[in-house]
């Protein structure tokens, strides 16, 4: 039944800036809300959101954070200004009750436009330290929600709330037998899932493939490589490659025993909620602002994960860290059981309701 309420989501650039929105959208659909989403023209958010029934996707111009000199950097302020004007028109036409932002540079013009339109907005920050897009958006927003309790010290006290990680309910409905069928694995060895982030990782992909002879003695391997990064020349029993997995991910997770992954916040909190021991290989500081290193070290400190820095990644270091992770897995799972993710979705929706009052 329609209730005439409308929520507008934004966020993109990587899957991590979309996942929380994907967790919240079904909640509001079940309650009869109208749902809009503002993203970029060609970002991964378009691929993830456009196929959803009952969600209207709108594209706007957006800038990009580059950690290197480029003439494109000179154009970005104008792209953000154009995106703000586009978002201003969309918000004026769609008249949302509230805007929920998951970050990424596409979100900056949307949150700014919401402020200009007098529409309240809420930002969700997944990482241990706030990203640049969210930092730029904070002055325009009503509330900022933190995934890590430690993040609160980096946020304005009058706007910040700790809510924890919002996990998609569907991830808890996966079936191991379906995951094994999808991947074509037998399940007679521990299943190792390798993920290099939504875009894949050349370094992780290369090291995994170089180590296959030894790794396949101990594991069956599901390797999510990234778009265009599958190596069709490798055909080995117990090893399967995918560019990307979307709807079947819950079943792949259910078939998984151990994970090798980057250390994006949303992904590692999903592994935590599913009690999957993980070896984290965070993006280096040269390739990022260092947020994944901080995320990974936080999980290591809490004994949820083992960490291998990318600069130290070799066949030998990978094999030794995996062996240690495998031995420690029962202890890690016991530690993971102490973490409760069930209250996070409720906390977020209650804050959304309060901000709208």
Curated annotation (Swiss-Prot):
Main location (coarse class): membrane
InterPro entries in UniProt: GlcNAc_MurG (IPR006009), Glyco_trans_28_C (IPR007235), GlycoTrans_28_N (IPR004276)
Record has NADP as a keyword: no
GO biological process terms on file: carbohydrate metabolic process; cell division; cell wall organization; lipid glycosylation; peptidoglycan biosynthetic process; regulation of cell shape
Membrane topology category: Peripheral membrane protein
Localization, UniProt: Cell membrane
GO molecular function: UDP-N-acetyl-D-glucosamine:N-acetylmuramoyl-L-alanyl-D-glutamyl-meso-2,6-diaminopimelyl-D-alanyl-D-alanine-diphosphoundecaprenol 4-beta-N-acetylglucosaminlytransferase activity; undecaprenyldiphospho-muramoylpentapeptide beta-N-acetylglucosaminyltransferase activity
UniProt entry keywords in alphabetical sequence: Cell cycle, Cell division, Cell membrane, Cell shape, Cell wall biogenesis/degradation, Glycosyltransferase, Membrane, Peptidoglycan synthesis, Transferase
Catalytic activity annotation: di-trans,octa-cis-undecaprenyl diphospho-N-acetyl-alpha-D-muramoyl-L-alanyl-D-glutamyl-meso-2,6-diaminopimeloyl-D-alanyl-D-alanine + UDP-N-acetyl-alpha-D-glucosamine = di-trans,octa-cis-undecaprenyl diphospho-[N-acetyl-alpha-D-glucosaminyl-(1->4)]-N-acetyl-alpha-D-muramoyl-L-alanyl-D-glutamyl-meso-2,6-diaminopimeloyl-D-alanyl-D-alanine + UDP + H(+)
EC numbers: 2.4.1.227
Binding residues for UDP-N-acetyl-alpha-D-glucosamine: 14-16, 168, 198, 292
GO cellular component terms, semicolon-separated: plasma membrane
Keyword Iron: no
Pathway the protein takes part in: Cell wall biogenesis; peptidoglycan biosynthesis
The protein's role, per its UniProt record: Cell wall formation. Catalyzes the transfer of a GlcNAc subunit on undecaprenyl-pyrophosphoryl-MurNAc-pentapeptide (lipid intermediate I) to form undecaprenyl-pyrophosphoryl-MurNAc-(pentapeptide)GlcNAc (lipid intermediate II).
PANTHER family the record matches: UDP-N-ACETYLGLUCOSAMINE--N-ACETYLMURAMYL-(PENTAPEPTIDE) PYROPHOSPHORYL-UNDECAPRENOL N-ACETYLGLUCOSAMINE TRANSFERASE, UDP-N-ACETYLGLUCOSAMINE--N-ACETYLMURAMYL-(PENTAPEPTIDE) PYROPHOSPHORYL-UNDECAPRENOL N-ACETYLGLUCOSAMINE TRANSFERASE 1
Family designation: Belongs to the glycosyltransferase 28 family. MurG subfamily.
Protein's recorded name: UDP-N-acetylglucosamine--N-acetylmuramyl-(pentapeptide) pyrophosphoryl-undecaprenol N-acetylglucosamine transferase
Protein source organism: Oceanobacillus iheyensis (strain DSM 14371 / CIP 107618 / JCM 11309 / KCTC 3954 / HTE831)
Gene: murG
